[in-house]
Structures are given as C-alpha cells and as structure tokens.
Amino acid sequence: MWPFISQLNPDAGTVAAGFPLEVDLAPVAEGQVIKVFWRGQPIFINHRTPKEIESAQTADWRSMRDPQPDSERVKPGKEQWLVVSAICTHLGCIPTEHQGNYDGWFCQCHGSQYDSSGRIRLGPAPLNLALVPYKFDGDAKIVIGET
C-alpha cells in the first residue's frame, strides 16, 4: 500500500519549482538583461543603466495606461535592478529586451512596447509587466519568491 501512496507525492522538480530562487547578480553587466525561471515562469532581471533609470524616473507615469511610478517597481537604494515577469500582459508572448521606442521591451507578437521600468507604453497590452516578489540578500544576490 505504501508504494502506491508514495507515488502520489510530487516529484523533486515540482517541489523545487515552488521554492525561492537565489540569483547571483555579480556577473550581470550594467545594461544586461538575464532570464531565469521561477515557478515555471520566465523572469527578466534587468541591470539598468543610469540613462534607463533616469528615463524611467522622469517619464510622466500618471498618463500611462497602467500608471505606476518607477519607485514602486524597484527596491529603494537598488534602482539599478528591475525584476519582472517576462510574459507580455496581452496574450502571453515573451518580449525582446532593449527594443522598441522606450528602451525597454518589445513584444513581437502584437507590438506592445514597455519602457525600462516594464510599464506598458504602446500597443494592445493592458498592464505593465508583472512584478515578482523578491528580496536582496547582500549587494550581489536576490532571492525570488521571498519579500
């Protein structure tokens, strides 16, 4: 009876998919975007340049479709790091980084454009790229899935 019941337990991959994910940021160069997977979903981690940060902070967020200031999308004192879902909020495609008119992401499926803060600026997507829970563990490591 026990072998049958134990087969109902989730496999190691399923269990691991729900656990927090540690990411070492040290090798990520300024201006580089990396993709990781957490809970089976792609996540963008963007090491933003000073130009990208300034552009995101000075944009008129109140006039955007899904208004949100850059300060609500990054951690205080760590504005160079943006961590968002890599899934377009229109129909679920994966946008391409550093493309489009806003130095952010461009979704080739239907033309949605996001800025360097992951906010929707143009196209059919209704919402900003979703934020994911994460916290810093020191200066060069984040833990996705914890706050």
Place the predicted regions along the sequence by residue:
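A sequence-level detector of short, solvent-exposed, charge-rich linear segments
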Residues: 20-24, 47, 107, 137
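Short, surface-exposed binding/anchoring microloops in extracellular/periplasmic proteins
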Residues: 37-52
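C-terminal segment of N-terminal export signals and the immediately downstream linker at the start
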Residues: 1-41
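Rieske [2Fe-2S] iron-sulfur-binding domain
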Residues: 54-147
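Alpha-helix initiation/capping motif
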Residues: 24, 49-50, 71-72
